[in-house]
Curated annotation (Swiss-Prot):
Binding locations of Mg(2+): 225, 246
Disulfide links within the chain: none
Record keywords, A-Z: Cytoplasm, GTP-binding, Hydrolase, Magnesium, Metal-binding, Nucleotide-binding, Potassium, tRNA processing
Positions with a binding annotation for (6S)-5-formyl-5,6,7,8-tetrahydrofolate: 20, 78, 116, 439
PROSITE patterns (UniProt xref): G_TRME
The organism of origin for this protein: Ehrlichia ruminantium (strain Welgevonden)
Described function: Exhibits a very high intrinsic GTPase hydrolysis rate. Involved in the addition of a carboxymethylaminomethyl (cmnm) group at the wobble position (U34) of certain tRNAs, forming tRNA-cmnm(5)s(2)U34.
Cofactor note (record): Binds 1 potassium ion per subunit.
Enzyme class per UniProt: hydrolase
Encoding gene (name): mnmE
GO CC terms in record: cytoplasm
UniProt-recorded Gene Ontology molecular function terms: GTP binding; GTPase activity; metal ion binding
Name recorded for this polypeptide: tRNA modification GTPase MnmE
Length: 439
């Protein structure tokens, strides 16, 4: 394979920039930059870099990782330079004379091809890079440690063990008894049940990775946009005394106790003849259905006239807020028609902490295990596991052992696709194409 190079740190001015070279000719970097110091593997060495005219480009730290003891499994040279745009450009220009620029995720792809990581760990790397909150990072780090790989390899090995027994029965049919068939059926049912339980996770790993959606819902002028802006800590939504100001769905990302929360502002729900407002209301109702949690807003002045359409939105995913509660001193829950409301006044900054705490409790009840237990984190993983389950479901012991064995092989292959024991170009492009250049 060609020797590749790329800037690993973000482009722009910084204290330090890191440029990585990987491949069988990576050590040619030393000769090209006229490095006279002896470079030892896994030792940081301070040295100047020279261009062809023997002019100093920069004084850098060089770290050399000899194959196979590197991230990619190849010889790797890292140049830790000053984060000057001019210096970075000059070094990349020099490297371009002897090596090939790396594509997105190409270093990680080589790590996979050299058995340094499986596909689930590779996906975890990009998830960690993209993590914006503590819980997202914890989930990615757990997956990077191999929790998913070990789980899937365990199921794969169990299927292979069953397959081995079946192959023996095919070779020695006189050994096949009713109890032997029952035992195989029992083992396959246990594996299938484990896989199905893994699938029936409410997509929590994927939701945590992408963000937990919380929709703010209520009548027009119930304070939805005001609360939305307050939680976002900036003016995103237009706030007006006129009802129906918000027509479209707005989103902002916030961090609550380490969880990635996507707060959604929606149009006020009411009867309207305005076609544009009607579309906004339709979208608000769709968000009410698809959101992970809901904040239901009721203005204090309307506490004695609850809107049935709003009440119908309240369920166990809801947090009810009595908005515009400027004159209320208590921070205790207020019960209205057997529904507990949190009194909140954004303008007086009252009840906000109580609301955030309520959101945190709802989220933790559903997602606290995502950072400690192996959950599915991508649609790619889910598809292959579902395929494996479907194959196992369709196995009939009325068929010849040879056909059952073939179905087992297909199920094993689906699990192998998850971790990358077998793969194709489309799968690899799907995984590594999401990486940035330099990783």
């Amino acid at each position: 394979m060609s020797t590749i190079f790329a800037l690993c740190t973000p482009w722009g001015k910084s204290g330090v920039a890191v440029i990585r070279v990987s491949g069988q000719d990576a050590v040619k970097t030393f000769m090209h930059f006229k490095i006279s110091n002896a470079i030892k593997p896994r030792v940081a060495t301070f040295t100047p870099l020279y261009n062809a005219a023997h002019e100093v480009i920069d004084e850098v730290i060089v770290v050399y990782f000899s194959a196979p003891n590197s991230f990619t499994g190849e010889d790797v040279v890292e140049l830790h330079t000053h984060g000057s745009i001019a210096v970075i450009r000059m070094i990349l220009c020099e490297l371009g004379k002897i090596f090939i620029p790396a594509g997105p995720g190409e270093f990680s792809l080589r790590a996979f091809l050299n058995n340094k990581v499986d596909l689930t760990r590779a996906e975890a790397i990009v998830d960690l890079i993209n993590a914006e909150t503590e819980m997202q990072a914890k989930q990615a780090i757990r997956q990077m440690s191999g929790s998913l790989e070990k789980l899937y390899q365990s199921w794969r090995q169990q299927l292979i063990d069953v397959l081995s027994n079946m192959e023996a029965y095919i070779d020695f049919p006189e050994e096949v008894t009713s109890s032997a068939v029952e035992n195989i059926s029992f083992l396959l049912d246990k594996i299938k049940e484990s896989l199905e339980n893994h699938l029936n996770d409410g997509r929590k790993g994927e939701i945590l990775r992408q963000g937990i959606y919380v929709a703010i819902l209520g009548e027009p002028n119930s304070g939805k946009s005001t609360l939305f802006n307050h939680l976002a800590k900036r003016d995103i939504a237009i706030v007006s005394e006129y009802a129906g100001t918000t027509r479209d769905v707005l989103e902002t990302h916030i961090d609550i106790a380490g969880y990635p929360i996507v707060i959604i502002d929606t149009a006020g729900i009411r009867d309207s003849n305005d076609p544009v407002e009607q579309e906004g209301i339709r979208r608000a109702k769709l968000k009410a259905e698809s959101a992970d949690f809901k904040i239901i807003m009721l203005p204090y002045e309307k506490k004695d006239a609850l809107n049935n359409e709003i009440i119908d939105l309240i369920d166990d995913r809801s947090i009810c807020v009595l908005s515009k509660s400027d004159s209320i001193i208590t921070q205790n829950l207020i019960n209205i028609n057997n529904i507990n409301f949190i009194p909140v006044s954004v303008c007086c900054n009252l009840g906000i902490e109580h609301l955030l705490s309520a959101i945190q409790k709802k989220v933790e009840a559903d997602f606290k295990f995502c950072s400690t237990s192996p959950f599915i984190t991508s649609e790619r993983q889910r598809v292959h596991i579902q395929n494996a389950v479907n194959i196992l479901k369709n196995i009939s012991f009325e068929l010849p052992m040879e056909l059952i064995s073939e179905d087992l092989r297909l199920s094993v292959r689906e699990l192998e696709k998850v971790v990358g024991v077998i793969s194709n170009e489309e799968i690899l492009d799907n995984v590594f194409g999401k990486f940035c250049i330099g990783k």
